[in-house]
From Swiss-Prot:
Residues where Cu cation 2 binds: H122, H161, H487
Name of protein: Multicopper oxidase MmcO
Cofactor(s) this protein requires: Cu cation
Catalyzed chemical reaction(s): 4 Fe(2+) + O2 + 4 H(+) = 4 Fe(3+) + 2 H2O
Residue ranges occupied by any Plastocyanin-like domain in the UniProt entry: 190-349
Induction, as annotated: Repressed by RicR. Induced by copper.
Sites where the protein binds Cu cation 4: H437, C486, H491
Taxonomic path: Bacteria, Bacillati, Actinomycetota, Actinomycetes, Mycobacteriales
Length: 504
């Protein structure tokens, strides 16, 4: 395993023989072609021209980064348990894709699953027809091929995953890093951390869990705890319930806590840690024992450096932090928030033995970084929104009915939000439910507006707590048809999604 992930794959390449394995499929909640308003021929041509013009305006370096992905069934070793699951080329996580601002990424995908699939490039402000989500991009049928081709305009930590049904709760995910040729930070090493919650091949399948969650006859206790299996505890950071599912395992870079991966560095080195939460239903509180962390980026964009001891990271969020390595062996612990379990990896800079796999460092309970603590760097500010242009994003639903909605409708009957190119609306998040929801907008980032009206962090995914209202400014600069949804995979499939459609 390469220890310094400056290029290539930063993860173990554990390969095992294939075995035909596909669980029961759930139809994609994002196949909107049948229910979406069909544009006229002139309207479609105008949108295509607008998408092409936006692509031409992006920076272009003249370089091309190529990759090949093969989503397929595989047998994977999680560090003891060997599971049948779905992966990109027999590894969890999949291979790192790395580019520099302005590069063109060309990824050829061959679908060896028994169901349609896609690859969504999470957080990248790419051209709409390469987003990897219906209706903008058609799914790839079983046995089919597709080539994604797009330029990358912004540096940052991103990731890729499917956008079909519950495929996001298998092993189909990989990191994407876009380097900044003018990177102002100085560091000696880079450590990519991908968090995950895991049931596939060990516990009930994602499809079985979804069936339990949507069963109108499920036990009353499940309606209040949100946990079909195991015991959960309330989370103060999340405003209550920590999630819907108690998973058998929680992973860092594809490994269970007793078989944690180890990152080797030298005492005194500055390490940039890129943290990605790929989990389907779990937010994590993450800390590195014996170290403080300086948060430098949220969802790829720079913030005023802020020192914390731990971080709350919701599903699909990314944080970049800097640490100065001490001497010894230190666990990096990701507490599954509200679920009384953890994932871990090890930082090894010298002699020593790691503590017990269930060890929880004190730092988890000290200064915990949450989104409202961070402010975008001047270079990342989006400015003020238009004073009279609000876009409502009202989150609704209950655990009892599992009827998650945005603006009162499930995705199948959604009324899309509308913007015109160049507008600067305010996203008005309003969570009327008793659960937290990490809300993600495709193809864009937005800038949070703090409670006092001051500018906050740039985000493409933000946790909206129960009964919380939040605001963010959006710059409409990427024409197309874009999905906005809860990044709890189960809420998303149940209907908590809408669209942001550009009007020409």
């Amino acid at each position: 395993m390469p220890e310094l992930a400056t290029s290539g794959n930063a993860f173990d390449k554990r390969r095992f023989s294939r075995r035909g394995f596909l669980g029961a499929g759930i139809a994609s909640g994002f196949a909107l072609a049948a229910c979406a308003s069909k544009p006229t021929a002139s309207g479609a041509a105008g949108m295509t021209a607008a998408i092409d013009a936006a692509e031409a305006a992006r920076p272009h370096s003249g370089r091309t980064v190529t990759a090949t992905l093969t989503p397929q069934p595989a047998r994977i070793d999680l560090g003891g348990p060997i599971v049948s699951t779905l992966t990109y080329g027999n590894t969890i996580p999949g291979p790192l894709i790395r580019a520099t601002v302005g590069d063109e990424i060309v990824v050829s995908v061959t679908n060896r699953l028994g169901d349609p699939t896609s690859v969504h490039w999470h957080g990248i402000a790419l051209r709409n027809d390469m987003d990897g989500t219906e209706p903008a991009t058609a799914n790839i049928g079983p046995g089919g091929d597709f080539t994604y081709r797009f330029s990358v305009p912004d540096p940052g930590t991103y990731w890729a995953h499917p956008h079909v049904g519950l495929q996001g709760d298998h092993g189909l995910y990989l990191p994407v890093v876009v380097d900044d040729p003018t990177e102002p930070g100085h560091y000696d090493a880079e450590w990519i951390i991908i968090l995950d919650d895991w049931t596939d091949g060990i516990g009930k399948s994602p499809q079985q869990l979804y069936g339990e969650l949507t069963d109108p006859n499920k036990p009353t206790m499940q309606n209040t705890t949100g946990m079909p299996e195991g015991e959960g505890v309330d989370s103060n950071l999340l405003g209550g319930d920590g999630g819907d599912i108690a998973y058998p395992y929680y992973l860092i870079n594809g490994r269970i806590p007793v078989a944690a991966t180890s990152f080797k560095a030298k005492p005194g080195q500055r390490i940039r840690i890129r943290i990605i939460n790929s989990a389907a239903d779990t937010a994590f509180r993450i800390a590195l024992a014996g170290h403080s962390m300086t948060v430098t980026h949220t969802d790829g964009y720079p913030v005023i450096p802020t020192e914390v001891d731990a971080l709350l990271i919701g599903m699909a969020e990314r944080y970049d932090v800097m640490v100065t390595a001490a001497g010894g062996v230190f666990p990096l612990v990701a507490l599954a928030e509200g679920k009384n379990a953890l994932a871990r990896a090890l930082l090894s800079t010298g002699a020593g033995s790691p503590p017990d796999p269930q060890f929880r460092p004190d730092e988890l309970n000290w200064r915990v970084g949450t989104v409202e603590m961070f402010t975008a760097a001047t270079t990342a500010n989006l400015g003020r929104p238009e004073p009279t242009h609000d876009l409502p994003v009202t989150l609704g639903g209950t655990m009892a009915k599992y009827d998650w909605t945005i603006n009162g409708e499930p995705y199948s009957t959604t009324n899309p939000l509308h913007v015109r190119l160049g507008q600067r609306p305010t996203l008005m998040f309003d969570n009327t439910t008793m659960m937290y929801h990490p809300i993600h907008l495709h193809g864009h980032t937005f800038q949070m507006i703090k409670a006092d009206g001051s500018p906050g962090a740039r985000k493409d995914t933000v946790i909206v707590l129960p009964k919380q209202k939040m605001r963010a400014v959006l710059v409409a600069d990427n024409p197309g048809v874009w999905v906005m949804h809860c990044h709890n995979n189960y809420h998303q499939v149940a209907g908590m999604a809408t669209r942001l459609d550009y009007i020409l």
